[in-house]
Amino acid sequence: MGLLEGKAAVVTGSSRGIGAEVARFLAAEGAGVVVNYRQKAPRANKVVAGIEADGGRAVAVGADLTVPEGPAALVVAAQENFGGLDVLVLNASGGMETGMEEDYALKLNRDAQVNMLTQALEAMPAGSRVVFVTSHQAHFIASVPTMPEYEAVALSKRAGEDALRAMLPQLEEKGISLVVVSGDMIEGTVTATLLDRANPGAIEARREEAGRLYSVAEFGAEVARMATADVPSGHTEYVGGADYLAAGENA
């Protein structure tokens, strides 16, 4: 029996990349998983089909987290399909896309995260777990500068983390824990691709600095592990980038 047998999970931004890997890992542990997409239904349906082919349970749900009805739709989907909501993985993020409004990064990386958690709290019982996914470039932005092309996104993601941490007393009252997973640059993600396009050679330079970069599957496994890990609420799990940790401690 898996660690999440009979439980229900929502993974935001899970039609591809890290979120899709997290959804697969959680389903393999027995959870029924709501796979969230914003526009690309075929990608999400493919993730669901893969989970079901492996004997898991999942459903694809289209929801834009930056509008009020988006988070609510994901909570309802978890309740209607899997009987509740026990694990919430806040993976969706953005801000480097072209053609978006000026404040989109803050709307998605801070406001939408808070709105999603606020909606989820109504459905999550004591003992539930919330996992927020971020990057070292965002988590350590106050002490370690990042590349200019990513700075606005990093600041908005750090604002999101701070806003979620401000909810810790509210979570504690309900017996719900929050864990933050912070990772170095991850090979093969959309963000890494966009950064390398805006700043050619950025990925290779970071790889040389760090020694190695985690793959999407490796990082996804670490995020999924935090859904059941025996760690205190408010814990930050660092994945890769030892130089960031040293710089952050010395700042």
Language model features with spans:
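Catalytic Tyr-X3-Lys loop
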Residues: 100-121, 127, 131
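Catalytic loop of short-chain dehydrogenase/reductase
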Residues: 93-99, 129-173, 185-189
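The beta1-alpha1 cofactor-binding region of Rossmann-like NAD(H)/NADP(H)-dependent oxidoreductases
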Residues: 41-42, 62-74, 110
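C-terminal helical subdomain
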Residues: 174-182, 197-251
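Conserved glycine-rich Rossmann-like NAD(P)H-binding loop of the short-chain dehydrogenase/reductase
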Residues: 29-46
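Rossmann-fold scaffold of SDR-type NAD(P)-dependent oxidoreductases
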Residues: 12, 85-93, 109, 132, ...
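Conserved glycine-rich cofactor-binding loop
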Residues: 8, 15-17
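A glycine-rich helix->loop->beta "capping" turn
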Residues: 54-57, 76-90, 177, 232
